[in-house]
């Protein structure tokens, strides 16, 4: 326990930086606004309504922040919908938005400086390819073939607001910044309760994604730090218990000598002391804990995680958030793919002299497919098709030029194919491609008050080339003379791209 506290203090004790005065600098809000534009979601997912940046309003905000009653009035009226009880809703909403964006930049500075001043001998080599989301599947394919059980974990959220502030106190000792953080959390929800309301939780997430991501990542990093430490300690249990294990073998031999030995006693004890070979993978709010251990050991880890969240973060984790399954008989939804490790039987004919016989060989393969229902539901929510997958026009885009409409539909199609190129069955992708292509044709026909057939005949091959994906272009260049190879062989060919650093917006529309 003393070692645990020592490592915990080293993890929490960092050089502190006082960054609160930066909130009174105009360049900070300009930088936050420009950074938000560069880090925005793809244009086809966002709405057309964008808030404009005004340097004049930023100067007015800084002047008001110098006033003594600026924060006092805000704290005394926490239940009001408008920031600072401003009469004009536009000004109130703009001030709260731009101030929260600037604050999100400020609280990230100590963490950025910590990496900047990291000693060179302790620097970890950075591999750009490992940033890709698809690199995770290469890891899963390499490790999961030898494992037995799987725990699908939904990381508990939301968490009590005061715990979020306490977690940041270990890294940021800038007291005014922490008070300002309490002010923002108090503004978005009721301070005296848990954020158990889905409406309050998603309000903070919608209003300021950058601040929400920072708070959530701080919470998850603290959660994983303690979890990883205890996991490393538990991996040493087989070595630490070797002495007792040998004594137990010696004692069991004595019992066997007297004729009262249980045949299954030794085997069960051996499995209990084996290293479980656990692997942990997380992205956003979902995590996977795979192991080679028994189901009994996985149940112990399940209740350990429940108690860990309860006593370390004062948060009650429902056991139903952790699902235990056998890896060979189940599939799990992760990063927009339905992954599984099925067992298949392969018949091998063996010839030995004059005799021949068949041998049944079981093989395991890491399989990834595209969830058709989920993607069609996302396209339906984005108004590209109906709930049953019937393509419809998108009226909101009829005001754009023909080239912009073709470009938007083409980029959506290419992004879907690019992200889901690791699917072993691509028929679902071809169905989505058909939906987007026909939806584009209906949108153009609606704009020009024509029929779909007439517009398709007018555009011809130009219309089809806009939906020609990168994967198809590669295969068409490699096999120009044998075009049938692509249509026959590439349905099961999986391609993992190492340049994808963001999950597709249509895959997870709730995040």
Swiss-Prot record:
Q: Which GO terms describe its biological process?
A: mRNA processing; RNA splicing; tRNA processing
Q: Name one GO molecular function term.
A: RNA binding
Q: Which GO terms describe its cellular component?
A: chloroplast
Q: According to its UniProt record, where is this protein mainly located? A: plastid
Which key words tag this protein in UniProt?
Chloroplast, mRNA processing, Plastid, RNA-binding, tRNA processing
Compartments annotated for it: namely: Plastid, Chloroplast
Q: Which domain of life is it from?
A: Eukaryota
Q: Does the keyword RNA-binding apply?
A: yes
Q: InterPro entries of this UniProt entry? A: Domain_X (IPR024937), Maturase_MatK (IPR002866), Maturase_MatK_N (IPR024942)
Q: Which family does it belong to?
A: Belongs to the intron maturase 2 family. MatK subfamily.
Q: What does this protein do?
A: Usually encoded in the trnK tRNA gene intron. Probably assists in splicing its own and other chloroplast group II introns.
The protein, known as: Maturase K
* Gene field: matK
């Amino acid at each position: 326990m003393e070692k645990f506290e020592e490592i915990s203090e080293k993890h929490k004790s960092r050089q502190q930086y006082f960054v609160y005065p930066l909130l009174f600098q105009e360049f900070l809000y300009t930088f936050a606004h420009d950074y938000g534009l560069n880090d925005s979601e793809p244009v086809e997912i966002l709405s057309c309504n964008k808030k404009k940046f005004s340097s004049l309003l930023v100067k007015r905000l800084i002047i008001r922040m110098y006033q003594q009653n600026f924060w006092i009035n805000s704290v005394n009226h926490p239940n009001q919908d408008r920031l600072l009880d401003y009469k004009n809703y536009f000004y109130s909403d703009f001030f709260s938005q731009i101030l929260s964006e600037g604050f999100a930049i400020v609280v990230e500075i100590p963490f950025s400086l910590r990496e900047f001043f990291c000693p060179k001998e302790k620097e970890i080599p950075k591999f750009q390819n490992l940033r890709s989301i698809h690199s995770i599947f290469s890891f899963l394919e390499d490790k999961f073939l030898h494992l037995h059980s799987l725990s699908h974990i939904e990381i508990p959220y939301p968490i009590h607001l005061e715990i979020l502030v306490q977690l940041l106190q270990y890294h940021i000792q800038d007291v005014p910044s922490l008070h300002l953080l309490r002010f923002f959390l108090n503004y978005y929800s009721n301070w005296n309760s848990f954020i158990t309301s889905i409406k309050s939780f998603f309000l903070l997430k919608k209003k300021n994604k950058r601040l929400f991501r920072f708070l959530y990542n701080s919470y998850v990093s603290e959660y994983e730090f303690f979890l990883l430490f205890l996991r490393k300690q538990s991996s040493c249990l087989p070595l630490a218990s070797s002495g007792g294990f040998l004594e137990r073998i010696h004692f069991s031999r004595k019992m066997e000598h007297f004729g009262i030995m249980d045949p299954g006693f030794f085997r069960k004890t051996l499995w209990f002391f084996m290293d479980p070979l656990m692997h942990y993978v997380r992205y956003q709010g979902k995590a996977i804990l795979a192991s080679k251990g028994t189901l009994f050991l996985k149940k112990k880890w399940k209740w350990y995680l429940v108690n860990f969240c309860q006593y370390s973060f004062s948060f009650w984790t429902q056991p139903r958030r952790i699902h235990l399954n056998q890896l060979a008989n189940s599939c799990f939804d992760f990063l927009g793919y339905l992954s599984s490790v099925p067992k298949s039987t392969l018949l091998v004919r063996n010839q030995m002299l004059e005799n021949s016989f068949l041998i049944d060989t079981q093989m395991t393969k890491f399989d990834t497919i595209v969830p058709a229902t989920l993607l069609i539901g996302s396209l339906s929510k984005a108004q590209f098709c109906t709930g049953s997958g019937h393509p419809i026009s998108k009226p909101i885009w009829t005001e754009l030029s023909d080239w912009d409409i073709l470009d938007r539909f083409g980029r959506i199609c290419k992004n879907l194919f690019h992200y889901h190129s690791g699917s072993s069955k691509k028929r679902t992708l071809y169905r989505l491609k058909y939906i987007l292509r026909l939806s584009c044709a209906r949108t153009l026909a609606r704009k020009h008050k024509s029929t779909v057939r007439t517009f398709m005949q007018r555009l011809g091959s130009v219309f089809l080339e806009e939906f020609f994906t990168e994967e198809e272009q590669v295969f068409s260049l490699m096999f120009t003379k044998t075009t049938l190879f692509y249509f026959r062989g590439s349905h099961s060919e999986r391609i993992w791209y190492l340049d994808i650093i963001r999950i597709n917006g249509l895959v997870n529309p709730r995040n």
